[in-house]
Amino acid sequence: MNSLDLPKAPQDTRVVVAMSGGVDSSVVAGLLKRQGYDVVGITLQLYDHGAATHRRGACCAGQDIHDARRAAETLGIPHYVLDYEDRFREAVIDRFADSYIHGETPIPCVECNRSIKFRDLLATALDLGADALATGHYVASRPRPGGSRALYRALDPARDQSYFLYATTAEQLDVLRFPLGELPKDETRRLAREFGLSVADKPDSQDICFVPQGRYQDVIARLRPDSVRPGEIVHLDGRTLGRHDGIIGFTVGQRRGLKLATGEPLYVVRLDPETARVVVGPREALATSVIRLAETNWLGDEPLTELDGMPVAVRVRSTREPRPATLRWNRAASCAEVMLATPEDGVSPGQACAIYADEGPRARVLGGGTILRVEASRREAA
């Protein structure tokens, strides 16, 4: 076996690297090239900020493509740019907009990985004769007895991206490789300088790639102008406290920007797209104990539909550490259900819930799903 757990010698093993134009994927290409693999770089043209926000000169995607091409030239590997804009708009951007309109808080990176990178790009890589598709994600995969592979949290806890990759299927894991899963970020940047890459000190992206300056409301208003309608801001006790310009400007758990002179700290508890109401209340009203999941991807050893109280750890936001919980299959609702050991605040439909075997820093990823419904207590979810 070679360093990628593949049977052929590196020089006989073709690896397609998904090159975003950032330091991480560029270093992956450099590492594999140095190890003697037949490396091919592919960059996806996914979006145009100008088209999304209706502003001229708003596109930064062109710079990323330029950076990826320059990295490939420095490393001496072939590089191709593929136009995936139409499929990205349909699978990710349109779904993102529709989710917000329905009062949800979507995580578009999960859908991009699921539909674009690990489905469409993976198929393209195989068409090019690739033995593996490598990415710059900070997550680890390791072989298991029997020949299958499992997904694990990355070595660098500050960079771990397993939350966004829970939807990776077992079949995809057989072909995917994540060389940075065992490296700290500072080592990645050191390698970039060693390889002579111009992106060695390029800042990490902080925003959703197709949302400039983090203003997702502008993107949604542009894509779905008829869906933005004003409504009332209502307290849980029934009082009308004010008005708003559209529920797309709010997320569950939000406190800032409510502009309510009530003298008490209030948080967004629920969004009602049917009535265009933003429901607010005290922080304790945000506590969630039970989460029902949709579109569940399961990587565990036991069949998901046979689980009835499996101890796990779950992550409901990328910035939070996994917390203890119990996983079961709700036969009446025909969905997976997570019961949190300790209630969590700010859990919203549309968010991702990643499931781990335990709370450890290198825990195995067991899958996850999209949060369909939340309940304040176990009794309410029964």
Curated annotation (Swiss-Prot):
ATP binds at residues 18-25, 44, 136. Keywords: ATP-binding, Cytoplasm, Disulfide bond, Nucleotide-binding, RNA-binding, Transferase, tRNA processing, tRNA-binding. The keyword Disulfide bond applies. It is an enzyme of class 2 (transferase). One of its GO terms (cellular component) is cytoplasm. InterPro entries: MnmA-like (IPR004506), MnmA-like_C (IPR046885), MnmA-like_central (IPR046884), MnmA-like_central_sf (IPR023382), Rossmann-like_a/b/a_fold (IPR014729). It catalyses: S-sulfanyl-L-cysteinyl-[protein] + uridine(34) in tRNA + AH2 + ATP = 2-thiouridine(34) in tRNA + L-cysteinyl-[protein] + A + AMP + diphosphate + H(+). SUPFAM superfamilies: Adenine nucleotide alpha hydrolases-like. The keyword Nucleotide-binding applies. The record marks 137, 351 as: Interaction with tRNA. GO terms for molecular function: ATP binding; tRNA binding; tRNA-uridine 2-sulfurtransferase activity. One of its GO terms (biological process) is tRNA wobble position uridine thiolation. The active site is at residues 112, 209. Residues 159-161 are annotated as: Interaction with tRNA. It is found in: Cytoplasm. Belongs to the MnmA/TRMU family. Catalyzes the 2-thiolation of uridine at the wobble position (U34) of tRNA, leading to the formation of s(2)U34. This is tRNA-specific 2-thiouridylase MnmA. It comes from Methylobacterium nodulans (strain LMG 21967 / CNCM I-2342 / ORS 2060). The gene is mnmA.
